[in-house]
Each structure stands twice: as C-alpha cells, then as structure tokens.
Amino acid sequence: PAGVLIGPYAHLNLHGSVTVTTADAIAFDQGNFYATGENTYTALSQSPTGSLTFSNASPGSIVNEGDISVAPGETVTLTGGAVVSTGELSAPEGSVTVAAIPSESTVKITQPGSLLSLEIDPIVPIATDSTATDSNVTISPLDLPSLLVASEHKHADSLSVNSDGSVSLTANTANAANAESQFSIGAGSTVVSGSITVDNFSANTASGQIAILGERVILTDAMLSASGQGGGGNINIGGAHKGHFSLPSAHETFVSADTQISADALTRGDGGNVVVWADDTTQYLGDI
C-alpha cells in the first residue's frame, strides 16, 4: 500500500500477533500474499514466515497515533519506508519491532533462541553517500533538539502525510503570528514519540524485547519499558551491541531529554540490556 495511517482514536486489542506493513508481499510457507493483484489463497493456509518484500523504490510510510496491544507473548511489528509512532504499542512478555525500510529490500524478522534479529537484503544496490538523492530527508538528529524537543520556542505537536508518501512533523512557533513549521521525515526514518511496553508482571520470568530500527532513529518524549518480575528484557535502539549484524545499524540516532527507557528486574533476576547505537552519530539526552 501507499501508506498506513492509524488514527488517534483507533484501538486494536488482539489475541494474536499483529504486523502493520507497507510491503508489497508477505511470505507464507507455500506462497506469497500480494498487496495488489491476484492471490492464490489456498497457498496461504500456513503461518507467515516473517519475510516481507518491498519492491517499491520508495516504500509507503506508516503513522500510528492509536493504541495497539496484543496478548502476552505475542508480537507487534511496524515496517514501512518511514515509520512514526506517537501512540501506544503493548506486547506483554512479547516483542515490539518498529523498523523503517528505505528502499527495495527483502526483510526477514526472526527470533532465533531468545534474541530478536532482522535481516535486510537489498533487491537493488543502495546508492552510496556520494550518489544518493535523499531530498526528502531534511532532519538529522543533530537538528532535533531545536526542532522536536519542547521548549519555549517550538515543539512538534502534529503529523501529516504528504502526497509523495513522506511524513511531516508540524511545530507551532511562539511568534505573534503563531506560524507553523514543517519538518519532513523521509525514507529510512523511524520516529517514536509514544509508549512501547513489553513488561512482564504475571510471572517470575524475564520481560520481552523492543527494537527501534532505521537509517535515522529518533525518540522524542518516548517511554520504552521492558521490565519483568524475573528480569529485564532487551531494548535495541538503532541497532545491536557494537553494531552486530543481527540487526541493521542506524547512521544517526537521537534520543531526547524527555525520553525514558527502563529494563528493570522488578523482584528477582538481572536487569535487562539497553543498546543505543549508530554507525555515525549518536546523541543521547534521555534517562535509562
């Protein structure tokens, strides 16, 4: 699809897992489900394999302003060309993955053992920095303290989806005219400005896993929690520890001062693992 918008009054409370994606195809054991065109539904009787195909050079964006929750142990996955979540995502004892896929790729989300992994195989070569034409991307994490973090001057308070599929944050300025400024978030950007929880309060076992991934990862006024009665879970922002290949690494990662991240052991066990990573630039102002 060209894009997915989940509005502020939407509430999804599901017993199973949920995947929201702008992929062109979702792989099953015996075939693919295609977003457009004809499908052979008899081949889709088995479970999805976790493989998504993005064949569009500019995959559609996802904006979530609502609340999505699933049953304990299930998963919530949001994958698109750019992903913005200002609502609530909840998967107790399970996993939440929010990932931006900037170009034509095949994506496979797996959980070997107890660790989440995400593989991205480009369908066509990705342009290098010297040849890329990423004109929609007008925000870098170094700009965000003045653009997104609430201050006496301005703060981002609404979202809009442009005709080209890009997403804009709209900030009200404090001048007399109360003019608006828009900051475009292009392909490969993941923005979280809501809550994501995978806590485990029901048993003495560890919590679940959270992964926020993309070429540019932005957390502003966000709350991420992977705490559990028997131990904390894993939170990966921008990639894995030391850029390990199990997760794609961001080029730039920004975490605002009003973002809170926790992976606590509530009654027993060890605290969890929190990784904030970028290959090029990481700016971290929040609390862990």
What kind of region is each of these model predictions?
Residues 1-288:
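Extracellular and secretory-pathway beta-repeat/beta-biased strand scaffolds
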